[in-house]
Curated annotation (Swiss-Prot):
Repressor that binds to DNA sequences containing a bipartite element consisting of a direct repeat of the sequence 5'-AAAGTTT-3' separated by 2-9 nucleotides. Represses basal transcription activity from target promoters. Zn(2+) 5 binds at C814, C819, H832, C838. It comes from the Eukaryota. Transmembrane segments: none annotated. Zn(2+) 3 binds at C722, C727, H740, C746. A zinc finger (CCHHC-type) spans 357-400, 401-444, 713-756, 757-800, 805-848, 858-901. Its main location: nucleus. Zn(2+) 1 binds at C366, C371, H384, C390. SUPFAM superfamilies: CCHHC domain. It comes from Mus musculus (Mouse). One of its GO terms (biological process) is interleukin-6-mediated signaling pathway. This is Suppression of tumorigenicity 18 protein. It is found in: Nucleus.
């Protein structure tokens, strides 16, 4: 791509250069022949890797535009123009160092390759044209003309470069899209900076000296400026070609030609009349020959050659860097777009990221160019393979951000990130920790084994459809199940690991019977009239699915990554809005094995101990009592999608059928199931209404129509709901609504179980006629089953014993019809109020054809217990559950009645006291006076207390002041004592040598006496002392002078 751009640039830029090609060919092997460009071209030919231009443009920064010929911003181009201008004004000293032979030396061995050279870039052509122009000036015929042209060209180049610089600044202010005439063909920001530095270091002084030289020699060389003549000179045309706008460089006629021939022919044609026109021009002044000017021009040309060659080499390095970035981003895109390709279910394999080749370790790095991994959110460079946590994300174009959006998603279609092993959606970029992917993998393995062992074929009328056609044979009154354990275990393996349908489990266990609904857009295909459907077969309790929004179809295996249909979101919204009231769609699950599993009614039994049985092992199917039918009925229905074992929604009826055979530990045969005929179902009093309803919609509900497949995400939303009715997931033990799929940690499960126990257990009443359970010794109506603690049983001191007729009441006898109480396990007739210990009930249970109908005594248990208080409808109870309220303890109406009774008792006591004369007027007055006196005395005492408190506070303040004064006095005394001790020691030391008459030497023992004697002597100075005494006093004065008080 870069080679094509260079050829086009060479082709368009070399059209206006007037240089004779015959003279340029000997100079093509100059040392500055752009070796880096040839090396890059050789590497491209060796690699031969095509680069997608669209992807490479997306990966490159915004300022990079290869279709414009690798043009840079106007600022960089201005710097390069300044470089060219600086090169034109070189110093005279450097020009004198380089000779003409050194600059234009050409080896003789390169003459054989003159005609085979190609011009790889425009700077190479510019260098060779300028070099040839220097050689042209050696000839004596045009020596004077060339000297004049050199001086004028330098001045004109300086003026034009200044004009171009000003023009480029104006265009850059207007905008980037405006093209100005100062753009060089190859430049980069790094090149401009380095060239400007080199110009400042090496040629900065030369520009100044050249300007000074031209200024001094201006009067000597007076040339007339003619624009037309300057444009016809080859040197000027070669320099002015850089300033031609890009719009004039593209020629439609020359684009189809060879790049070499297209620029060689106009050069030869235009170069011939150039110098005759210059010689004929009479506007040029004749000056004397000066070799210094020629050498100066040669030095300028050599410096210009070096600058252009350096710029070409750096431009090649710049394009090589972009080429590496293109390859890196192509590899990264190829790695990111390896997503799981899911094929059709007809036998093709599934390719996921697990089977795709693992990328190399060195490629697991940040995709942002120039990012070394520091400052990432993850803090670990090898694990950062996306743009989400990179601090340099703002510098990435929007196209790259759009390409890397899929990295942040789970690759499993329909997965929202819930239930992952690492519980983080952003870090989940593979199928390893996704529960939906694991379920699909299991489904594929089961589907493969299922397709191998399948015995059913496609329906001939629907053979053109892609989806498979299943056949289900519903055999009513068929033979008993006698399949061996090997085949039964093989069938059990197929249906062992399937998702459980909690919605239908709620419908079966908790007694919810929503209306039969079908999904929108589902239409049952009409049945063809046949003998098989003359007597239509109805399925009393088919396997219901989780609802219309969770149809028993998994998404197709060929569903591509990133496809999210609208019905997925609609179904998800329906699943969220329909958590509390789940709709049951009575559809029969289609499989490749003929089967029809029946679900029984919503009877939950409570045994004699009050324990709720949730094992679903009641009403076991005994095939011995079911007579076989003569001709089975077969229904062939087209399935909407290839059926997998994982798409089977297992509800309570399915597990009942599993448990009703021989228990959970025995293999079960799924090949056939048994049902009832219409006559038996119509005789059944419980399921009669349900059968009538299902007669109308049996065909519509049992055959799902071909509907667009729903994602397993909708199925998952239904499965993660709490099975407790009315539970929104709050208050669970686990603290996570999504992980709560059982009743074990639900706070509402206890209330629900209590309500079920109360709904299915017999009402426990007090046997005393007219007793509502209030006032019992135990305080609990439910535990009161005898007359021992009943207050009404001993009313009036009469012992009320139940009569024979009362014992035979329906509440006290066995609920089994025909049982007289004999043979019970408890051995006591009166305490036998359930069918658990009745031998007749066990016998009838064994003989009963298990058709899903409850026993006769179980029908009597369906009556719900009610509040015993007359007029109470169950509202406002303490436990907020009417079903479990069987006493007056939590009834609000009873509480109001009790309050009224207490108030009436208090009024009665007041009335009795008033009538007894206790509350007389005189006594009340006397008591009032005493109370007044007490109040007055209390006020006086309070006033005295206030006075005492004020006195106490004043005394306390005085005491504090006295204590502070004492502290000050003590401190002054201590200081005085210290000072006295110091003075005494000083006096003793000073008077140690002086001895008073009649006294010994001074010391601490006689210090006071010594001081007293001295005071007496000094106080009686008026007396006449002997000269000895006066001398002694003088000596004492001299000794005491050193003491300072």
């Amino acid at each position: 791509m870069d080679a094509e751009v260079e050829d086009k640039t060479l082709h368009t830029l070399s059209k206006g250069t007037e240089v004779p090609m015959d003279s340029l060919i000997p100079e093509l092997r100059v040392p500055y022949d752009c070796s880096m460009a040839k090396k890059r071209r050789a590497e491209e030919q060796a690699s031969g890797v095509p680069i997608n231009k669209r992807k490479s443009l997306l990966m490159k920064p915004r300022h990079y535009s290869p279709d414009m010929g690798c043009k840079e911003s106007p600022d960089n181009r201005n710097e390069d123009d300044g470089l060219l201008e600086t090169n034109d004004h070189a110093t005279a000293d450097e020009i004198m160092v380089k000779s003409m032979d050194e600059t234009l030396h050409l080896p003789a061995q390169d003459s054989s390759l003159q005609k085979k050279d190609q011009y790889t870039c425009y700077p190479e052509l510019m260098v060779k044209s300028l070099v040839h122009l220097g050689k042209f000036e050696e000839s004596e015929s045009v020596q004077t003309t060339c000297e004049n042209l050199n001086g004028s060209s330098i001045q004109s180049l300086k003026a034009e470069s200044d004009e171009a610089h000003e023009g480029s600044m104006v265009h850059s202010d207007n905008g980037r899209d405006k093209v100005h005439h100062s753009q060089p063909p190859f430049c980069s920001s790094g090149d401009s900076e380095s060239d400007s530095d080199s110009a400042e270091n090496g040629w900065g002084n030369g520009s100044n000296s050249s300007e000074d030289t031209d200024t001094h020699k201006g009067p000597k060389h007076k040339l007339t400026y003619n624009r037309k003549d300057l444009l016809e000179v080859p040197e000027i045309k070669a320099e002015d070609d850089k300033f031609i706008p890009c719009e004039n460089r593209c020629d439609s006629d020359t684009d189809g030609r060879d790049p070499q021939n297209s620029h060689m022919e106009p050069l030869v044609v235009k170069a011939q009349p150039s110098f005759p026109e210059v010689e004929e021009g009479e506007s040029l002044a004749t000056v004397t020959e000066e070799p210094a000017e020629v050498e100066k021009a040669k030095g300028n040309l050599s410096l210009l050659e070096q600058a252009i060659a350096l710029q070409a080499e750096r431009g090649s390095v710049f394009h090589h860097t972009y080429k590496e970035l293109d390859r890196f981003f192509l590899d990264h895109l190829a790695r990111e777009r390896r997503q799981p390709r899911v094929t059709d279910a007809n036998g093709r394999q599934i390719f996921t990221n697990k089977h795709s080749p693992r990328p190399e370790r060195r490629e697991a790095k940040c995709p942002i160019p120039g990012c070394d991994g520091t400052g990432h959110v993850t803090g670990l460079y090898p694990h950062h393979r996306s743009l989400s946590g990179c601090p340099h994300k703002v510098r990435v174009p929007l196209e790259i951000l759009a390409m890397h959006e899929n990295v942040l998603k789970c690759p499993t279609p329909g997965c929202t990130g819930r239930g992952h092993v690492n519980s983080n959606r952003n870090t989940h970029r593979s199928l390893s920790g996704c529960p939906i992917a694991a379920a699909e993998k299991l489904a594929m393995t089961q589907d493969k084994s299922q397709l191998d062992s399948s015995q059913t074929g496609q329906c001939p009328e629907q053979a053109h459809r892609v989806n498979l056609v299943k056949q289900i044979e519903f055999n009513f009154r068929s033979h008993a199940i006698t399949s061996p354990r090997a085949s039964a275990s093989k069938e059990q393996e197929k249906f062992g690991k399937v998702p459980f349908d909690y919605a239908s489990f709620d419908a079966q266990v908790f007694g919810k019977r929503p209306l039969l609904q079908t999904g929108q857009g589902q239409k049952a295909p009409p049945f063809p009239e046949s003998k098989h459907f003359s007597n239509p077969v109805k399925f009393p309790n088919g396997l219901p699915s989780a609802g219309a929004h969770t149809q028993s179809t998994v998404r197709a295996s060929s569903y591509g990554h990133g496809q999210y249909s609208e019905d997925t979101h609609i179904a998800a919204a329906a699943a969220i809005l329909n958590l509390s009231t789940r709709c049951r769609e009575a559809t029969d699950i289609l499989s490749n094995k003929p089967q029809s599993l029946r679900a029984k009614g919503a009877e939950i039994e409570v045994d004699e101990n009050g324990t709720l049985d949730l094992s679903m092992k009641k009403n076991r199917i005994h095939d011995k009592s079911i007579p076989p039918t003569s001709s089975p009925t077969t229904i062939t229905t087209p399935s909407s999608s290839p059926f997998n074992a994982s798409s089977l929604l297992v509800n309570a009826a399915f597990y009942q059928a599993l448990s009703d055979q021989e228990g959970w530990n025995v293999p079960i045969n799924y090949s056939k199931s048994h049902g009832k005929t219409e006559e038996e179902k119509e005789k059944d009093p419980v399921n009669f209404l349900e059968n009538l309803e299902e007669k109308k919609f049996a065909g519509e509900a049992s055959i799902p129509s071909p509907k667009p497949k729903l994602h397993t995400r909708d199925l998952k939303k239904e499965l993660i709901t709490c099975p407790t009715p009315g539970c929104d997931g709050s208050g669970h033990v686990t603290g996570n609504y999504a992980s709560h799929r059982s009743v074990s940690g639900c706070p509402l499960a206890d209330k629900t179980l209590k309500s079920l126990m109360a709904a299915n257990s017999q009402e426990l009443k007090c046997p005393t006629p007219g007793c509502d359970g209030s006032g019992h010794v135990t305080g609990n109506y439910a535990s009161h089953r005898s007359l021992s603690g009943c207050p009404r049983a001993r009313k009036g001191g009469i012992k009320m014993t139940p009569t024979k007729e009362e014992k035979e009441d329906s509440e006290l006898r066995c609920p089994v019809i025909g049982c007289d109480g004999q043979g019970h396990i408890s051995g006591k007739y009166t305490s036998h109020r359930t069918a658990s210990g009745c031998p007749l009930a066990a016998k009838r249970q064994k003989e009963n054809p298990l058709n899903g109908a409850p026993l006769s005594w179980k029908l009597n248990k369906q009556e719900l217990p009610h509040c015993p208080l007359p007029g109470c409808n169950g509202l406002g109870h303490v436990n907020n559950v009417f079903v479990t309220h069987r006493s007056l303890s939590g009834c609000p109406l009873n509480a109001q009645a009790i309050k009224k009774v207490k108030v009436s008792e208090e009024l009665m006591t007041i009335k009795l006291k008033a009538t007894g004369g206790i509350d007389g007027d005189e006594e009340i007055r006397h008591l009032d006076e005493e109370i007044k006196e007490l109040n007055e005395s209390n006020l006086k005492i309070e006033a005295d207390m206030m006075k005492l408190q004020t006195q106490i506070t004043s005394m306390e303040s005085n005491l504090k002041t006295i204590e502070e004064e004492n502290k000050l006095i003590e401190q002054s005394n201590e200081s005085l004592l210290k000072e006295l001790a110091g003075l005494s020691q000083a006096l003793i030391s000073s008077l140690a040598d002086i001895q008073l008459p009649q006294m010994g030497p001074i010391n601490e023992q006689n210090f006071e006496a010594y001081v007293n004697t001295l005071t007496d002597m000094y106080s009686n100075l008026e007396q006449d002392y002997s000269p000895e005494c006066k001398a002694l006093l003088e000596s004492i004065k001299q000794a005491v002078k050193g003491i300072h008080v």
